[in-house]
From Swiss-Prot:
Residue numbers spanned by region Disordered: 1-29
One GO CC term on file: mitochondrion
Domain remark text: Consists of three domains; the N-terminal catalytic domain, the editing domain and the C-terminal C-Ala domain. The editing domain removes incorrectly charged amino acids, while the C-Ala domain, along with tRNA(Ala), serves as a bridge to cooperatively bring together the editing and aminoacylation centers thus stimulating deacylation of misacylated tRNAs.
This protein's name: Alanine--tRNA ligase, chloroplastic/mitochondrial
Residue stretches spanning the membrane: none
Subcellular location: Plastid, Chloroplast; Mitochondrion
Cofactor detail note: Binds 1 zinc ion per subunit.
Function per UniProt: Catalyzes the attachment of alanine to tRNA(Ala) in a two-step reaction: alanine is first activated by ATP to form Ala-AMP and then transferred to the acceptor end of tRNA(Ala). Also edits incorrectly charged tRNA(Ala) via its editing domain.
InterPro entries: aa-tRNA-synth_II/BPL/LPL (IPR045864), Ala-tRNA-lgiase_IIc (IPR002318), Ala-tRNA-ligase_IIc_anticod-bd (IPR018162), Ala-tRNA-synth_IIc_core (IPR018165), Ala-tRNA-synth_IIc_N (IPR018164), Ala-tRNA_ligase (IPR050058), Ala_tRNA_ligase_euk/bac (IPR023033), Ala_tRNA_synth_plant (IPR027522)
Residues that hold Zn(2+) according to the record: 672, 676, 774, 778
Record keywords, A-Z: Aminoacyl-tRNA synthetase, ATP-binding, Chloroplast, Ligase, Metal-binding, Mitochondrion, Nucleotide-binding, Plastid, Protein biosynthesis, RNA-binding, Transit peptide, tRNA-binding, Zinc
Necessary cofactors: Zn(2+)
Length: 994
């Protein structure tokens, strides 16, 4: 799907990028009903009104009037289609009828009673390589909308978890922007269309949820007369409250070509008293869009013309947080019961009253509440903090939450001051109706947050040191150029983006030292980042240029590879440089799509098969050969065979013989089954709580990442190897079954943390040893693995360890390579294999002796150099009794400088102050400060004095009052640094001596 528009301000990403407006300061009024109970049920606990709108009622309680309670009473509607899970729509007779949970449940019940299948939310990690994260409810149905996959049901309804970070800077500033939100949706796949979608949306809004009809406005595409007439003639919306809007706002497209159509949006009017004149639906102070209906009815052609689709679809999205805001009558989404308990927890940890806080403090609390929701659900879906891809999204959100909390003074209960886990506990507490798996994964989520926050605090401390260096350089440069000192926008952005430094803190620290901030330059860097983020989140498209045409002709690939390594298949499509072609000739790199294949496509950690495609004529003459070097999945289950035409010509429609390289497949099978055995062994040796965090199943090795807090001991690694080799020797037959996900979990099958599974799953079992959900290829008997060897164990991230190992043929190759290396080592050292360790130890001892001798010679040379420069010492103070020496010592290292300084202290005698600097290696600076007792006694310390000098050289350091060492990475600044040291010593010593 090429180039889907996803402007940040819309529920469904389909109307134009309107400029966000500041939330109104006025607050809606409430009617206090004295004859009713003074509390409301939220579905979790009975809470004070501050849960819903603390900014309105810092004290007291709020309840709904009787009439409104009756209007929002639970319906006894029977769904005609059974839901997937009871948790999605189970009746909650005691819940507040307008709680977030009740709204979600009632939405799903409403459409279930209209023959929609209630489907669970998809993972935040989409099954689509062209999209970073799940950003809309329609994403899990994208292959169906594109005609790439058959529909399983004609109608569906979901409550989809979504993540959007392309507008993260607006979070907390506006009333409605979020990184995590829920999109309630109803979908039709060639079943009902515009009339039903519009009427049901209106019925849901006005009858099910009781929204006043006179407060609802509608937007339609300017040329969509059909939608206009349905809204006006059949629903009864006055013409004055129906706005025709242009293509940018109300026409959804999937790219240059492909499925598209007009859309219609429902808006709630907070201020109907303003009338109809000059009304702008983009005015956030008055309106909020809460429901969006997309009518997919056209196919956009290459020439821009629109042709009617054979199958017309409905794709809708209703923002749960937005509707909750309306129904709960609070001034913004954050003060609904979906988010406010999290904000309340953050305020408690900061010892702040949200109700009495200023706007800036409230904004920061909203940021924390919003980001913690996104962080918890992302980690639950298997997205762990890292520096790339989805992991970087999580890491940035965590860092933004931490630095925002530090601004507010939020502190956890422990000695380390970590606070995110405490707030995340509240998110987990609220999670059962959003994602029931979150609570089960709570311990792992909290552990990951704890580790990441601690790591970031250390990063912040490094950032503080870097800021000090930047300010020192800015002051030095200003002194040279005789200009005002200024910190560049790039430096400020580096501190903000990499080290998590809020601009406010950078500005405050800089101003204390008389340094200004280049805010214009910083905004340029921020805008560049926004554009990159927007580009990353606006991509919901096929990976090929003419994806619309491809979608019409190619369907899911039938995988035959569990049962055979060769099969006859038909070429359905050829891609050359991303473009669909009819024919490809010899020498070309090509992507081949077949109707069926024995080739395994990369997934579940296992790499794709290698092999060949053969085209023959008359069952004998070979006319084309394609070497396949990789197989990937696209659009769900379309297998893309990537390779090179070695001979002949390949054409669309041609029948081919697809043959997998059997030897390489066997290597992959061996390593995949060995990976399952490794996970079982790890759980036995280090504990059942460890879990898989990633894997690679390759032809030459396997890699297994797992959650654990420390390196494994040699004895543990040996025990793991022995267990696995024992299971291999047992010669156990593997069992493979297909069953429901529920049955698999009840049977004890291990599911990959964060992996997305369908209703039916494949279970691979080594009886008595291992049972996992897995779609990969495996050996039939553990004896096929032959042998297993761990070749490395290391940490790759905080709390994540990695084991690399070999098995089968790769094990034999590894042992042979080790044997060859040992023979070469024995030959070089001229010893037997059993004598290598002793010989190496002897050589290392000899090396240490030689190094000590060299160091002693350098120290002597440094002392000699010191004796030559001692005469350059000069006296300061009124009595001229304090001797000062500041000199460069060429290329002596830190140890040699220390020897020289000690010699000079004895030679110059007390009182004396000595500063020495050198450049021992390219790109390095060494500094030493040595002060005799007489200098220390008058109030100057070497450890404190050397720090600012080292910063001028791009480094730092410190030490005792009488002796300190430092280093740096900017040798070109050494002369200026020593000059500053000389000047400062003269000023300080003269002042203190007098």
């Amino acid at each position: 799907m090429g180039g889907l528009k996803l402007p940040p301000q819309t529920l469904h990403g389909i109307h134009g990028g309107r400029r966000p407006l500041t939330a109104p300061s006025s607050k809606p009024s409430f009617t206090i009903q004295p004859n009713y109970s003074s509390s409301i049920s939220t579905g979790f606990t009975t809470r004070n009104v501050a849960l819903f709108s603390p900014s309105i009622f810092p004290c007291g309680y709020f309840i709904l009037g009787g009439a409104r309670e009756r209007r929002f009473g639970a319906r006894n509607t029977q769904a005609s289609v059974q839901p997937v899970t009871e948790e999605l729509v189970e009746d909650k007779t005691k819940e507040n009828p307008v709680s977030g949970d009740a709204i979600r449940r009632r939405f799903l019940e409403f459409y279930a009673s209209r023959s929609h299948k209630v489907l669970p939310s998809a993972s935040l990690v989409p099954d689509d390589p062209t999209v970073l994260l799940t950003i809309a409810g329609m994403l899990q149905f994208k292959p169906i909308f594109l005609g790439k996959a058959p529909r399983q049901v004609p109608r569906a309804t979901t409550a989809q978890k979504c993540i959007r970070t392309n507008d993260v800077e607006n979070v907390g500033r506006t009333t409605r922007h979020h990184t995590f939100f829920e999109m309630l949706g109803n979908f039709s796949f060639g079943d009902y269309f515009k009339k039903e979608a519009i009427k049901w949306a209106w019925e849901l809004s006005t009858k099910e949820f009781g929204l006043p009809a006179d407060r609802l406005w509608v937007s339609v595409y300017e040329d969509d007369d059909e939608a206009f007439e349905i809204w006006h003639d059949e629903v009864g919306v006055p013409v004055e409250r129906i706005k025709r809007m242009g293509e940018e706002d109300n026409f959804w497209t999937s790219g240059a070509t492909g499925p598209c159509g007009p859309c219609s949006e429902l808006y709630y009017d907070f201020h109907p008293e303003r009338g109809y004149k000059n009304t702008d639906l983009g005015d956030d102070s008055r309106f909020i869009e809460f429901y969006n209906l997309v009518f997919m009815q056209y196919n956009k052609m290459d020439d821009g013309s629109l042709e009617p689709l054979k199958q017309k679809n409905i794709d809708t999205g209703l923002g749960l947080e937005r509707l909750a805001r309306i129904l709960q009558k609070v001034p913004n989404n954050y003060e609904t019961d979906l988010i406010y308990p999290i904000i309340e927890k953050a305020a408690e940890l900061a010892n702040i009253s949200y109700a009495l806080a200023d706007d800036r403090t409230k904004m920061n609390l909203k940021i924390i509440g919003d980001h913690l929701r996104a962080i918890v659900y992302l980690i639950s879906d298997g997205v762990l903090p890292s520096n790339i891809g989805r992991g970087y999204v999580v890491r940035r959100l965590i860092r933004r939450a931490v630095r925002t909390g530090r601004l507010l003074g939020v502190k956890g209960g422990g000695e380390d001051g970590v606070f995110l886990p405490a707030i995340a506990e509240k998110v987990i507490e609220l999670s059962p109706h959003i994602d029931p798996d979150v609570k089960a994964r709570g311990h792992s989520i909290l552990d990951e947050l704890q580790r990441e926050e601690l790591r970031f605090v250390q990063t912040l401390e490094r950032g503080e040191k870097l800021l000090d260096q930047m300010l020192a350089e800015a002051l030095l440069n200003a002194q040279k150029s005789e200009t005002l000192p200024c910190l560049s926008g790039k430096d400020v952005f580096l501190l903000y983006d990499t080290f998590g430094f809020p601009v406010e803190i950078t500005t405050e620290v800089a101003e204390e030292q008389g340094v200004k901030i280049d805010m214009d330059g910083f905004e340029v860097e921020m805008e560049n980042q926004r554009r990159q983020s927007q580009a990353a989140h606006n991509v919901v498209k096929l990976a090929v240029e003419n994806g619309g045409d491809l979608a019409e002709n190619v369907h899911d690939t039938e995988f035959l590879g569990y049962d055979t390594l060769s099969a006859r298949a038909v070429v359905e499509s050829l891609l050359l440089n991303g473009k669909s072609v009819i024919q490809v000739s010899e020498g070309s790199e090509v992507e081949v799509l077949l109707n069926k294949t024995p080739f395994y496509a990369e997934s579940g950690g296992q790499i794709g098969d290698h092999g060949f495609l053969y085209v023959t004529q008359d069952q004998s003459k070979q006319t084309a050969v394609v070497e396949i070097k990789d197989v990937q999945k696209s659009l769900g289950s379309v297998f893309v065979h990537k390779g090179t035409i070695r001979e002949g010509v390949l054409e669309v429609g041609r029948e081919v013989e697809a043959a997998v390289d059997a030897k390489l497949r066997q290597r992959a099978k061996v390593h995949h089954t060995a990976t399952h055995l490794l996970q079982s062994a790890l759980k036995k040796v280090i504990g059942q709580e460890t879990s898989q965090a990633g894997s690679l199943v390759a032809f030459d090795r396997l890699r297994f990442d797992f959650n654990f807090h420390r390196p494994l001991h040699d004895s543990e690694l040996e025990e793991i190897e022995n267990l696995i080799n024992g299971w291999i020797g047992d010669g156990t037959l593997l069992q493979t079954k297909v069953m429901s996900l529920t049955d698999a979990k009840e049977a004890g099958a291990i599911a990959m943390f964060g992996e997305k599974y369908g209703e039916q799953v494949r279970v691979v079992e080594v009886p008595g040893v291992s049972m996992e959900l897995c779609g990969g290829t495996h050996v039939s008997n553990t004896s096929e693995i032959r042998a297993f060897k761990i070749i490395s164990e290391q940490g790759i991230a905080s709390g994540i360890r990695r084991i690399e190992a070999v098995a089968g043929e790769a094990f034999i190759e590894y042992i042979n390579a080790r044997d060859s290396q040992m023979k070469l080592l024995c030959s070089t050292l001229k010893v037997k294999a059993e004598e290598v360790t002793t010989r190496v130890d002897n050589l290392l001892e000899e090396l240490r002796t030689v190094r000590n001798e060299v160091s002693a010679l350098r120290a002597k040379a440094a002392v000699y150099k010191a004796s030559m420069i001692a005469s350059k010492a000069f006296s300061v103070g009124t009595s001229k009794t304090i001797r000062v020496l500041v000199e460069s010592m060429d290329d002596f290292d830190a140890d040699a400088l220390k020897s020289a300084a000690e010699y000079l202290m004895d030679t110059l005698q007390d009182p004396a102050a000595i500063i020495l600097g050198s450049c021992p290696d390219e790109g390095k600076v060494s500094l030493v400060a040595a002060f005799t007792p007489g200098v220390v006694d008058i109030g100057i310390q070497a450890g404190k004095f050397i720090g600012p000098i080292a910063k001028l050289c791009g480094g730092g350091g410190g030490g005792r009052p009488n002796f300190a060492q430092a280093g740096g990475r900017k040798p070109e600044n050494l002369t200026n640094a020593l000059e500053k040291a000389r000047t400062d010593l003269i000023l300080i010593l003269t002042e203190k001596a007098n």
